[in-house]
Amino acid sequence: MSVACVLKRKAVLWQDSFSPHLKQHAQDTANPNMPVVLTSGTGSQAQPQPAANQALAAGTHSSPVPGSIGVAGRSQDDAMVDYFFQRQHGEQLGGGGSGGGGYNNSKHRWPTGDNIHAEHQVRSMDELNHDFQALALEGRAMGEQLLPGKKFWESDDSSKDGPKGIFLGDQWRDSAWGTSDHSVSQPIMVQRRPGQGFHVNSEVNSVLSPRSESGGLGVSMVEYVLSSSPGDSCLRKGGFGPRDAENDENDKGDKKNKGTFDGDKLGDLKEEGDVMDKTNGLPVQNGIDTDVKDFSRTPGNCQNSASEVDLLGPNQNGSEGLAQLASTNGAKPVEDFSNIESQSVPLDPMEHVGMEPLQFDYSGTQVPVDSAAATVGLFDYNSQQQLFQRPNALAVQQLTAAQQQQYALAAAHQPHIAGLAPAAFVPNPYIISAAPPGTDPYAAGLAAAATLGPAVVPHQYYGVTPWGVYPASLFQQQAAAAAAATNSANQQTTQQTQQGQQQVLRGGASQRPLTPNQNQQGQQTDPLVAAAAVNSALAFGQGLAAGMPGYPVLAPAAYYDQTGALVVNAGARNGLGAPVRLVAPAPVIISSSAAQAAVAAAAASANGAAGGLAGTTNGPFRPLGTQQPQPQPQQQPTNNLASSSFYGNNSLSSNSQSSSLFSQGSAQPANTSLGFGSSSSLGATLGSALGGFGTAVANSNTGSGSRRDSLTGSSDLYKRTSSSLTPIGHSFYNGLGFSSSPGPVGMPLPSQGPGHSQTPPPSLSSHGSSSSLNLGGLTNGSGRYISAAPGAEAKYRSASSASSLFSPSSTLFPSSRLRYGMSDVMPSGRSRLLEDFRNNRYPNLQLREIAGHIMEFSQDQHGSRFIQLKLERATPAERQLVFNEILQAAYQLMVDVFGNYVIQKFFEFGSLEQKLALAERIRGHVLSLALQMYGCRVIQKALEFIPPDQQVINEMVRELDGHVLKCVKDQNGNHVVQKCIECVQPQSLQFIIDAFKGQVFALSTHPYGCRVIQRILEHCLPEQTLPILEELHQHTEQLVQDQYGNYVIQHVLEHGRPEDKSKIVAEIRGNVLVLSQHKFASNVVEKCVTHASRTERAMLIDEVCTMNDGPHSALYTMMKDQYANYVVQKMIDVAEPAQRKIVMHKIRPHIATLRKYTYGKHILAKLEKYYMKNGVDLGPICGPPNGII
């Protein structure tokens, strides 16, 4: 096995070259699984203590002085590194690619899975993998990437072959782990070689960590500490004492490339902004103070400044330092961390990265992790939360760093799990189904999602919080691996503890984001750590190793080859194996009430472990208490190692084999966890039950529970209440409660406060049916993408928490079409269902399929039209379905620009009961609705389609009493009054007639009032219209010349009684010539000629023919007039033959002149038509040439 040489910083232990006897001594002095802690000085010595603490003391908190370690410079031969690499059994010569090359060639700190093994011979495959990376870094220097043992520092001239940073290229010029574009001060992403972890001839789950014992830890230590240290500059500096800045003047340029941290260089840096801003050749972007800015991010850099050591004290071991830095249970006030900004604490003597601790706003009291003996927390967060309780604003760079802390957390312990062959594990931690090579990766994911559960995103696509990448086969792998590994796991407990402690990413009293369990490390909870390591390996199989309680990592067993085909578990492959942390480092809390309700609902709807929701101990969900659980005493991890909790924060007793997702407090029995028993099928469990992995919990305001609310930003739209959890299994998303993502790629937006955590977005398919792999989106049964947008749980935050974990039908499998919720809000504000409908993704959508969305559809232009069309042909049951949803919010729809049409359709096609129910909703709001643009239409429809004998109609109309004139003069209300006059029995409208008394002339000249007067004249009783007509006759002369009043007079002439017509004609007589030339009155004269009696008509025509207008007759004047010519035309049409002949003879002398006038031509055209039709010969129409008659 690999032997880690963990070095204390008290003495120079390695000479300028590799010493074979020293290496041999390291092998001889340690067990195969124990790290060789070589130390001298007053620090914590390598005593025969539990190996985990041994590694912790040496690798976590020891603070080597500048120059104490890392003597070997660039002059060191790479073959020496390979010589050390050969210490790993089953490892090829170039295996250093996992240890040295893993760091050296890994250009990304993202979980890209590239350049992690020694198999760099296939360059095209390496480049292909990098092309898959969404965050592919440019400037790749393949020639240097292929070096299995790349050094980080150059003692000699760096111009010999360019910068020697592992991120070869202009992206990070000199730094071993330089700042990336996306993240500053990220934890190193120690990536695993699939040849070591997933494939045959190798040890299981070999993921390298800077302080992990196995999987090439010794290789990484030797590679980065010995052969990559700044060589002679380290030897120049001794002890913890500060060194003069003058010593650095000569190699000040080198320091920028070396990225070393020199104790006194702090003084220079504070004066020298040039150096202060350059940590590894690039500016430090995370706002770290000058002391921290010079903090080298190079994992091989073992030099910590005296200022770093002083934080812990020269003689303080790592565990004590951690306890001092962060109180054991996270209760240390934030004030104790005030110096974090200006001081840096050694996180790992092998690796120093100056970085602000992430500020995940976890409450002051951290819930202890599940006892590693009983449940291995895939998300075991010990009470190390205070490291994330920084008040500083959380930067995106720091967030990314925290997201990648898990990458080094991989399989240091894995080779020690009984040395299980990969066959002992379910080989596919990603939900990339074991499809043959050449299969489309996304199509291959369909079957996997159907059987293994949530659709996942291959980690190459998203290096930040791999959304949806959950170990679907978590419990299945656990079952398979537990039996095979029980004996060996017991045997490996001690070693496992050591490696588990070592591989904590940056364990120790560092001020950088730490694994939340390092406090437990300080508390000497080695057996728990060992159990966590063993159980995690058992649970995750070869690719899922969360060796330390803390970040879950998910390493893929499949990759894409050069052709883009999916290769599953097909041997060691270059570019694969980067362990992926699944969720941000915090327990996901489920409120106890919601969890208990879900337990009850599950028990009612499922049958035992196979049914899926019995309160078994092996449950994927576990309610989380908000009290501060007390840390459990150490437990021997050899009792039950088959448990693996997703979000374990419970110290379970060693006899509880709970496989839970959400563990409650230590006092909570394990059998209260929700979910499936160990014998249940995880395909259905993870497919439907685990849809809401990141379901944020409502108890965001509790002072003690760990805070997991992913939406605690300032946006009210995305704020959750603190009352309840989104009920898992309500009627949307097939009963899966999803929480939204705080940022674009799982990162908090810059505007979001420190309270933001990283809840993965719901990229899980909730179907047991086919579901393609998708990037952060949900898919419904037909494979369509259904993205759960922010605020997806808003609708159901106050819903009953007793809902089933699954859909209301209590079935594990959803219906053919996904049930959308109103909470599935898109950025446009529309739900995903409506958005899909608007985009024609549902051409055959039915009313029953939009249940729960009727209100939203009704208020959308296209959705409203859809409902209107469906309602016309809907069955009574379908209409009732729609009606039930709109009734409570009927008024809201009545005043909506599109919703009012849906209400109107119900008045048209609904049953009488539905119409009356809606009418009751109108009652009390008739006036406001009548004056509203859309509400007035609804009232008109109600008045039109509700039988007039219904009492509700009369009651509605009476609400207008006292407001008649206001409504009549309103552009909307006048339509309501007109409809009332048309549809309501006249006896009920007397209040309208009364309101018009004395106002007839004013209303008749009003643009809206004139319409109401006409309706009254049409529909009201004679006794009701008489007073109106009386007022009209008194003002006929004015009304006929009014732009609106003339319509009232015309209406009387058309529909009025003969006596009323005669009165009007009498007013016109004697004024025909004048009124005929009036724009408005000419219309009245036309109507008089048309509707008057024969005698009256003859009198009017004669008046025109006999009257003279100056030298010409009135007829000639009228024929030339733009308005009066229409009166003449009408007279010709309606005159009796004898009178028409007279008119013709009167017109004939003016024919030649009429041709000069535009309007006169109308008269001539009328005459020609008439005479041609009747064959009457009046002689030549054309006059003499001179136009004189």
UniProtKB/Swiss-Prot annotation:
Its main location: cytoplasm. It is found in: Cytoplasm; Cytoplasm, P-body; Cytoplasmic granule. Residues 974-978 are annotated as: Non-specific-nucleotide binding in RNA target. One of its GO terms (cellular component) is cytoplasm. InterPro entries: ARM-like, ARM-type_fold, PUM-HD, Pumilio_RNA-bd, Pumilio_RNA-bd_rpt. One of its GO terms (molecular function) is mRNA 3'-UTR binding. CDD domains: Pumilio. Gene3D superfamilies: Leucine-rich Repeat Variant. The keyword Cell wall biogenesis/degradation does not apply. Residues 864-868, 936-940, 1010-1014 are annotated as: Adenine-nucleotide binding in RNA target. Residues 512-525 have a biased composition (Polar residues). It comes from the Eukaryota. Residues 24-65, 233-288, 491-525, 614-652, 743-774 are annotated as: Disordered. Residues 250-277 have a biased composition (Basic and acidic residues). Sequence-specific RNA-binding protein that acts as a post-transcriptional repressor by binding the 3'-UTR of mRNA targets. Binds to an RNA consensus sequence, the Pumilio Response Element (PRE), 5'-UGUANAUA-3', that is related to the Nanos Response Element (NRE). Mediates post-transcriptional repression of transcripts via different mechanisms: acts via direct recruitment of the CCR4-POP2-NOT deadenylase leading to translational inhibition and mRNA degradation. Also mediates deadenylation-independent repression by promoting accessibility of miRNAs. The pumilio repeats mediate the association with RNA by packing together to form a right-handed superhelix that approximates a half donut. RNA-binding occurs on the concave side of the surface. PUM1 is composed of 8 pumilio repeats of 36 residues; each repeat binds a single nucleotide in its RNA target. Residues at positions 12 and 16 of the pumilio repeat bind each RNA base via hydrogen bonding or van der Waals contacts with the Watson-Crick edge, while the amino acid at position 13 makes a stacking interaction. This is Pumilio homolog 1. It comes from Gallus gallus. The gene is PUM1.
